[in-house]
Amino acid sequence: MSRYTGPSWKVSRRLGISLSGTGKELARRPYKPGQHGPNSRGKVSEYGMQLTEKQKLRHMYGMNERQFRTLFIKASKIKEGKHGVNFMVLLEQRLDNVVYRLGLATTRRQARQLVNHGHITVDGKRVDIPSYHVEVGQVIGVREKSQNISTIKEAVEATVGRPAFVSFDTEKLEGSFTRLPERDELYPEIDEALVVEYYNQKL
C-alpha cells in the first residue's frame, strides 16, 4: 500500500484526528466525509476500532502500510517494556519525525520532503532517508547551503515550544534527542493497545 498523498483534511475528518495539528479540519465538520451530520455513525465493531486506531497512528506519522508494519515487527523484538509503547518510541526515532519535533518543519510531510531533498544532516553528514533511525545524542542539523530556505526559517520562527526530550540551538539550526520519550509525552488520544491487537490478528 502506497503512502497517501492527497488532502490531509479528508483523512483527518475520516479518522477524527487533526493531522495538521491545528484542529481546523475538524472545527467546522467534526464527522466523517459523506455523513450528513455528527449523529449518523453506526456502531463500530471491535475490529473496526482496532483498524481505525492503527490508521490514525499510521497517518499521523505519514507512513505507508509496509513501513508501518515493518517497524511494528521490529518493536516486537525489543525485550524490555510494552510492545505498543516501544512501537511509538521507534516511530518517534524516525529522522523525519525528529526534524518535525525540532521545529525545522511545520508538519511531518514537510519534514520528510526536507530529508528527501538532502537538506538534513546527522552528525554532520547528509542523510536523505526519512526512516533513518535516530539514536539519543545524535546531532540533527541543516546543511549549510540549505539554512536560508524560507520554509525552514519560517518553521523555526513559528515554533513556540518543543518536547522535553529534544534540545535545539536556534543559531546553529541543530538539535538532538536528549533522551527517549516517555509514553505520557506522546499522543494521549491514541490507544496503542488496539494497534497491537490489530496486528496480532494479522501477523
Curated annotation (Swiss-Prot):
Which residues belong to the signal peptide in this entry?
none
Listed under GO biological process in this entry are: ribosomal small subunit biogenesis; translation
- Which UniProt keywords are present, listed alphabetically? Ribonucleoprotein, Ribosomal protein, RNA-binding, rRNA-binding
Start and end residues of each S4 RNA-binding domain: 93-156
Question: Per UniProt, what is one Pfam family of this protein?
Answer: Ribosomal_S4
Instruction: Extract the coiled-coil ranges from the record.
Output: none
Annotated spans, Disordered:
22-45
Instruction: Name one cellular component (GO) term.
Output: small ribosomal subunit
GO terms, molecular function: rRNA binding; structural constituent of ribosome
Q: Name the job this protein performs.
A: One of the primary rRNA binding proteins, it binds directly to 16S rRNA where it nucleates assembly of the body of the 30S subunit. With S5 and S12 plays an important role in translational accuracy.
| Protein name according to UniProt | Small ribosomal subunit protein uS4
Top-down, what is the taxonomic lineage of the species of origin? Answer: Bacteria, Bacillati, Bacillota, Bacilli, Lactobacillales
